[in-house]
């Protein structure tokens, strides 16, 4: 039952207040897309292209296909879209999403895999560099989440919006 969520979104919309939604619910969230006009951002978490990986890590979340369909549907309706790319467990899959959804996502928020010793097997410096390069190469707006800043080279872009560098890593 999404009635409480819908009521909250309707209150924001009626008051002309901006809002952003982040969900793992996929197309279940599409029932509320009529409320987003002008004020809302629709977001989902995505870290995998392979639904078998998603099933192993997020068994109760909507499928990768359903989340991608929700992003594409929202974007086609003129709703601003964003993806929280985390936890990054399979770096290659995460970066493939940026390429696949480059025309449908207005902003990427790139994080890392925390709170699990297996995350130490990932070369976060390499991933951070590749994430920045992939976003820039596809023209994607992005923000590196704080957990990745230490892996970026000094001076590296950490936020990029509308073709403009908004923030860089300081030494």
Segments from the language model and where they lie:
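Conserved AdoMet/S-adenosylmethionine-binding subsite of the radical SAM
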Residues: 1-135
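C-terminal accessory extensions appended to soluble enzyme cores
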Residues: 122-171
């Amino acid at each position: 039952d999404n009635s409480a969520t819908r009521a909250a979104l309707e209150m924001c919309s009626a008051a002309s207040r901006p809002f952003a939604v982040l969900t793992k619910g996929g197309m279940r969230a599409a029932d509320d897309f009529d409320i987003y006009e002008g004020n809302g951002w629709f977001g989902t978490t995505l870290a995998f292209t392979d639904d078998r990986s998603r099933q192993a890590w997020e068994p109760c979340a909507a499928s990768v296909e359903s989340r991608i369909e929700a992003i594409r549907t929202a974007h086609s309706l003129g709703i601003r879209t964003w993806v929280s790319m985390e936890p990054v467990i399979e770096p290659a899959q995460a970066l493939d999403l940026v390429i696949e959804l480059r025309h449908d996502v207005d902003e990427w928020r790139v994080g890392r895999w925390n709170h699990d010793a297996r995350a130490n097997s990932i070369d976060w410096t390499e991933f951070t560099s590749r994430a920045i390069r992939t976003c820039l190469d596809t023209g994607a707006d992005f923000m590196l989440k704080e957990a990745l800043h230490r892996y970026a080279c000094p001076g590296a872009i950490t936020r990029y919006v509308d073709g403009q560098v908004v923030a860089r890593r300081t030494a």
